Design a protein with these regions (language model features):
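Acidic, glycine-rich active-site loops and adjacent beta-strand->loop/helix elements
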Residues: 1, 13-18, 98-102, 153-155, ...
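Glycine-rich loop/linker segments at domain edges
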Residues: 1-76, 153-163, 308-309
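Beta-strand segments within the central parallel beta-sheet cores of soluble alpha/beta enzyme folds
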Residues: 7-12, 89-98, 135-150, 179-181, ...
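Flexible glycine/proline-rich, aromatic-decorated loop/lid segments
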Residues: 15, 45-50, 167-169, 204-229
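Alpha-helical support elements that line or immediately flank enzyme active sites
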Residues: 26-37, 61-96, 108, 119, ...
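Helix-loop-helix junctions that connect adjacent transmembrane helices in secondary transporters/permeases
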Residues: 97-175, 301-306, 315
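Internal maturation/activation junctions in enzymes
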Residues: 135, 260, 272-310
Length: 320
């Protein structure tokens, strides 16, 4: 509309998949499924794609996996639309961005359960000082500086399919061991998953030793792909940490000879709520767990999700 409301989106993608099909349909699918949903006010959309064989190398998975190409096209079109409407491209986007609670167009009918895209746009506008730099500035000596921006989204694994598992235990020295099936391929997932456990257990990151993927001994994980590890394996790690924390309190209460609901755990000691001077250190509890107690201080948990909640991104650039 003339006031900047996007009523419909029509996207066509042509994908060169090389000499073999392999990831052809899924890659081209994401060019629409990870771009159209950004504009939640659209009342209708059409997404058509063709995948063609050529004599090029086979095309497979790479970071972004089709989403980046679709996003470049859609975001470029939105910027052109803003120019035709004589409207600030950020203002145009803020009128149309998907909101929490919206059914996302072209995203399998999923409801957007968590979203701060509009706030992300505003933050980027502030960071690049958009109000003083848009659309362009004459720097003299024939130089012009201009600013531009765009939005993006991804997913968090393949819904209903990806599986992540983790094993977490308390050692007799009061430190923790986290065993995961996810492979750290430079993404830092060993650190990320340890941070999740450390937050639940109220302990320093250095108190957790991570043993990465070893198919002979690690719990099962379907793979480190599709931006799934932090969400899927991370949730399994959180489940482990919550159960382990509960059992630490239970054993601590047993050693203090009081009910489990009468104690608290601060990451270092389990203490009686009514009398904090009565306490057992984590080392005491870990040591006691080795002597015939029926309370396990080791848990393995698995997580999968029927949804693939999208993280959102906004970028801006100043070019000369």
């Amino acid at each position: 509309t003339r006031d900047g409301i996007v009523k419909g989106i029509d996207l066509y993608t042509l994908s060169n998949t090389g000499a073999y099909g392999e990831h052809g349909p899924t890659t081209v699918g994401l060019s629409g499924h990870k771009s159209i949903p950004l504009y939640g006010k659209a009342e209708a959309f059409r997404f058509v794609s063709d995948v063609v064989y050529t004599n090029h190398m086979s095309a497979g998975a790479y970071r972004g996996y089709g989403a980046t190409q679709g996003l470049f096209a859609v975001e470029s079109a939105v910027n052109e639309l803003a120019h035709k409407l004589n409207m600030d491209p950020i203002a145009l986007r803020l009128k149309n961005t998907v909101q929490e609670g919206d059914v996302m167009p072209a995203y399998y009918g999923a409801v957007n359960t968590s979203c701060a895209l509009d706030r992300c746009v505003l933050k980027v506008r502030e960071m690049i000082d958009w109000e003083h730099k848009y659309p362009a500035r004459d720097m003299g000596n024939g130089k012009i500086r201009a600013v531009g921006m765009g939005m993006a989204m991804q997913g968090s694994g393949i819904s209903g399919m990806d599986v992540g598992s983790a094993t977490l235990k308390l050692n007799d020295d009061g430190f923790y061991t986290l065993m995961i099936g996810a492979a750290d391929m430079g993404t830092g997932c060993d650190t990320t998953l340890a941070q999740i456990a450390a937050e639940v257990l109220d302990c320093p990151l250095d108190n957790i030793t991570v043993f990465g993927a070893d198919t002979d001994s690690s719990p099962y994980d379907s793979g480190s792909y599709a931006s799934s590890t932090t969400y899927v394996t991370g949730k399994a790690t959180e489940k482990c940490a919550l159960k382990l924390r509960e059992q630490i309190c239970k054993l601590g209460a047993e050693l203090l000879e009081c009910p489990a609901d009468a104690v608290e755990f601060d990451g270092k000691v389990v203490f009686e709520s009514a009398d904090p001077t009565r306490q057992k250190t984590l080392s005491d509890i870990a040591f006691a767990s080795q002597f015939g107690h029926k309370i396990p201080l080791e848990f393995t948990e698995t997580h999968t999700s029927p949804l693939s909640p999208p993280p959102y991104m906004v970028g801006a650039a100043e070019v000369e």
